[in-house]
Amino acid sequence: MKRIAVLTSGGDAPGMNAAIRAVVRKAISEGMEVFGIYDGYAGMVAGSIQPLTAASVGDIISRGGTFLHSARYPEFAQKEGQLKGIEQLKKHGIEGVVVIGGDGSYHGAMRLTEHGFPAVGVPGTIDNDIVGTDFTIGFDTAVTTAMDAIDKIRDTSSSHRRTFVVEVMGRNAGDIALWAGIATGADEIIVPEEGFKFEEIVASIKHGYEEGKKHNIIVLAEGVMSADEFGEKLKAAGDTSDLRVTELGHIQRGGSPTARDRVLASRMGAHAVELLKKGIGGVAVGIRNEKMVENPILGTAEEGALFSLAEDGKIIVNNPHKADLALSSLNRSISI
């Protein structure tokens, strides 16, 4: 394989630029030509494809977002959109594609592979909801951003003896809430993967105040409900504390990536090129026990929440390895 392309798709994540940089520089070192596809699959269909050099990706490793830009393009789910994109790839002599993004992006990569264009997925999403990898690019930065914000909220919460509900991102996965909640010593961590009762939370808040506690921090994953709705239901369940709600929002998707995300993105980008060089497509790279791995895209493009609830109320473990990591971390924090 002599000519490949790289694109970013879906929601942006800190570290995407580091991954692009690794793809470009690794490919050049292997004697390949590299093209950047701007604006994701929409740009592929529109022919927004330009050659990239080592200079093109200079000084981007520390930048958040993606310099290739990103866009959601549901039309690529249709065969007509796929064929238009493939026509553009052929026009530029491209033989393989690295797709950086989340589960929706992976579905597009799978379609490309089915049409004879090897595509390798690189997990770029702050949600950490991709099966087959312990961590996704951007997750560590998002957790760090949430942690910093919650630390600041704790200062004002304690000053005014208030209860704060802090809503963090993560879509249908509670990973950001779990890790940020542990890191900030939150009083309650509410995630989609685990049930809860408002009455029990209210009782816990009341007991805390009776024991001399000055304030409370509740970290809420957006996949459960909005912070406003949660606050209203908490009040309806009998909470009488001075309650405030905060939605951290898109600040979690921005900012300079952490060292961990930069290194992770660099390793994943380079590994994706190694796979394409061997003619391997239809797979997504990941990290397991600090080692690079690859898994069939078909299995990794499903929802990657750690747990889900069955109709009988039992917890189903969707990703045992990630669940073990999270639960062991939670258990350690409780025992400290």
Swiss-Prot record:
Pfam family, one: PFK
Primary subcellular site in the record, as a coarse category: cytoplasm
Matching InterPro entries: ATP_PFK, ATP_PFK_prok-type, PFKA_ATP_prok, Phosphofructokinase_CS, Phosphofructokinase_dom, PKF_sf
SUPFAM superfamilies noted in UniProt: Phosphofructokinase
Annotated binding of ADP, by residue: 21-25, 154, 185-187, 213-215
Subcellular compartments: Cytoplasm
Binding residue positions for Mg(2+): 103
Main enzyme class: transferase
Active site: 127
Activity regulation: Allosterically activated by ADP and other diphosphonucleosides, and allosterically inhibited by phosphoenolpyruvate.
Catalytic reaction equation(s): beta-D-fructose 6-phosphate + ATP = beta-D-fructose 1,6-bisphosphate + ADP + H(+)
Residues reported in the UniProt entry to bind ATP: 11, 72-73, 102-105
EC number: 2.7.1.11
Keyword vocabulary terms for this entry: Allosteric enzyme, ATP-binding, Cytoplasm, Glycolysis, Kinase, Magnesium, Metal-binding, Nucleotide-binding, Transferase
GO biological process: canonical glycolysis; fructose 1,6-bisphosphate metabolic process; fructose 6-phosphate metabolic process
Positions contributing to substrate binding: 125-127, 162, 169-171, 222, 244, 250-253
Biochemical pathway: Carbohydrate degradation; glycolysis; D-glyceraldehyde 3-phosphate and glycerone phosphate from D-glucose: step 3/4
Keyword Amino-acid biosynthesis: no
GO MF annotations in UniProt: 6-phosphofructokinase activity; AMP binding; ATP binding; fructose-6-phosphate binding; identical protein binding; metal ion binding; monosaccharide binding
GO CC entries: 6-phosphofructokinase complex
Quaternary structure annotation from Swiss-Prot or TrEMBL: Homotetramer.
NCBIfam families in alphabetical order: PFKA_ATP, PRK03202.1
Family recorded in the similarity comment: Belongs to the phosphofructokinase type A (PFKA) family. ATP-dependent PFK group I subfamily. Prokaryotic clade 'B1' sub-subfamily.
Protein name: ATP-dependent 6-phosphofructokinase
Annotated gene: pfkA
